[in-house]
Structures are given as structure tokens and as C-alpha cells.
Amino acid sequence: MKKILILVLMACATAFTAQAQEVYKRILKVSKQTAADKSKSIDVRKVATFKVDELNYMAMKSKELMPDSTVRMLDTQAYAMHEFINLFFKRLSEAKKKTQKELIMARFKNASINNSRFNDMDKELVLSYYDNGNYMTQFSLDTDWVKALAEIRSKR
């Protein structure tokens, strides 16, 4: 399990040197490539799949509900999501006991569900990863990642 987490962290720790307006596109591109790369472990590919689904959902809902929103908003949310997931795996890898890991999982899940961005009523879609034991990234798609990340960072 620890090896898997370390591999996931390494895959997620891709350096982003893109300019601010390219963050969303860069994370999406790298995540799509990782999700399709059969040489990567299934767990790494599942994390990348979550990122792709989340980024596509975010863009779709932003266009639908906030047509005047800027590319910068998508970049900011995408970067915060990337940081949130990296911090999640970092803290999981640091946890020694199963109870600590369960507490970390609960804190991150709660931060994602308690910080809704779009207030989407399509719960089947929004919660498609939330209680799905097949994925480590059991987070709501309808998340304000900036707020969720701030919540997690404020509670160590």
C-alpha cells in the first residue's frame, strides 16, 4: 500500500511550469496521458481519471452556470484541486496507523463535500466517486477546491 501511495505521489508531483492561463490545460493534458498509460499502476491511472473527470465537470458547469467566468478561475480551481490531491496522498503516506488513515480520508472527503462550488442537485453525478471504494480519490465533483484546500490546511 505504501509503495502505491508513493507512486501516486510521484505521478501527481509533476512540475507545472506553464503560465497561469495554461494551468487547467496542462493538468488536464498530463492527467489524460497518465490515465491512458498502461505502464502506470492502476491506482495511479485511477487518480488521473478522477482528475480528468473533475476538470471536465468543472469546465462544463462553469460554462453552463458562469459563462462570463474567466480562464483564470478554472486555472485557480484546477491548481487547488491538484494541490488538494497531492496533500491528501502526502498525509496518507505519513500516517502510521489504520485509524489515522481513516481520519485523514474522512477529513478530506468532508472538505470536498462541505465546500460546494455549483450546488449541483445531480447527486448521482456529483457523488460518483464519493463513496466508491474502487478509488482512493473519494471526493465530490462539485467542490470549490480553493476553499476545500484552505480548510484542510487550516486543520493539521
Task: Write out the residue ranges for each language-model feature.
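Surface-exposed, polar helix/loop patches in the mature regions of secreted/periplasmic/lumenal proteins
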Residues: M73-R156
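Generic secretory/membrane-interface signal
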Residues: A11-A13, D37, S62, S116, ...
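N-terminal cationic leader/targeting segments used for protein routing and processing
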Residues: K3-I4, R26, Q33, K98-E102, ...
